């Protein structure tokens, strides 16, 4: 297993400087890093003098982070837990929460975890290594259900064609490897020379989100952060695709009282604002960062500042994703 310090050398957390500037961690500030991963944000927060509770559902991340715990003892506590439960790890409210949504670099780098089509491995994709795998989904769900997953969670334009191909081919040979699935999708859809995005990208995204219930996890995590932040506390969320970013944008919009209005609909009465958003439109990577860290290309940071108002009820309808709310994802 790769040690934490070795990972830190190769791992560059995206939008690190905007995250630190936005969260403004003071010496002694209590911060929750809900997505520890390779420890990039946590390490930077600790160096700024903060006290950090870092969560990750991936046991590999927790194991690899023990050297960091020793280095920064007693200011770092690592907990194997989903970030949707972050309000259960402290009794007092905190100064900041940071969430880096999606798959981590170290998960993508390890072929045996089955997250990447660029490195052949078992069709797994489980962050916590419990529950059903991506292979289970691909080999057992009906084509209409696969198409729904690919279309909604991956925003894949060829969702139906890909789902029907999978249903037909798995009768002869089940999909067991990431390379098998990626090759089959590329053979079906085709790929023009110079195409930067592999045709299997959105399908792999959709499967990963479904297997790990990432949409439900994000929604519950936003509500949990609202409950646990002090007045003036800051919530930062880094997302990597439009579905996640729309959820975060909508959350801050509704919680700030600036919900999407329409001249065709009656005015919506809103509760007292629990957040006000910073940096309208969010923050994306600078040209300098893009050159140093290409992974930051699709990243967007949104930050909200907690008000003194009481936390509001957790209502999934807020996100306008009724068709997604029925997905149980990794809870099966």
From Swiss-Prot:
<dbReference type="GO" id="GO:0005737">
    <property type="term" value="C:cytoplasm"/>
</dbReference>
<dbReference type="Pfam" id="PF01795">
    <property type="entry name" value="Methyltransf_5"/>
</dbReference>
<keyword id="KW-0489">Methyltransferase</keyword>
<keyword id="KW-0949">S-adenosyl-L-methionine</keyword>
<comment type="similarity">
    <text>Belongs to the methyltransferase superfamily. RsmH family.</text>
</comment>
<protein>
    <recommendedName>
        <fullName>Ribosomal RNA small subunit methyltransferase H</fullName>
        <ecNumber>2.1.1.199</ecNumber>
    </recommendedName>
</protein>
<feature type="binding site">
    <location>
        <position position="56"/>
    </location>
    <ligand>
        <name>S-adenosyl-L-methionine</name>
    </ligand>
</feature>
<dbReference type="InterPro" id="IPR029063">
    <property type="entry name" value="SAM-dependent_MTases_sf"/>
</dbReference>
<keyword id="KW-0963">Cytoplasm</keyword>
<dbReference type="GO" id="GO:0070475">
    <property type="term" value="P:rRNA base methylation"/>
</dbReference>
<dbReference type="InterPro" id="IPR023397">
    <property type="entry name" value="SAM-dep_MeTrfase_MraW_recog"/>
</dbReference>
<dbReference type="InterPro" id="IPR002903">
    <property type="entry name" value="RsmH"/>
</dbReference>
<keyword id="KW-0698">rRNA processing</keyword>
<keyword id="KW-0808">Transferase</keyword>
<comment type="function">
    <text>Specifically methylates the N4 position of cytidine in position 1402 (C1402) of 16S rRNA.</text>
</comment>
<feature type="binding site">
    <location>
        <position position="83"/>
    </location>
    <ligand>
        <name>S-adenosyl-L-methionine</name>
    </ligand>
</feature>
<feature type="binding site">
    <location>
        <begin position="39"/>
        <end position="41"/>
    </location>
    <ligand>
        <name>S-adenosyl-L-methionine</name>
    </ligand>
</feature>
<dbReference type="GO" id="GO:0071424">
    <property type="term" value="F:rRNA (cytosine-N4-)-methyltransferase activity"/>
</dbReference>
<feature type="binding site">
    <location>
        <position position="107"/>
    </location>
    <ligand>
        <name>S-adenosyl-L-methionine</name>
    </ligand>
</feature>
<feature type="binding site">
    <location>
        <position position="100"/>
    </location>
    <ligand>
        <name>S-adenosyl-L-methionine</name>
    </ligand>
</feature>
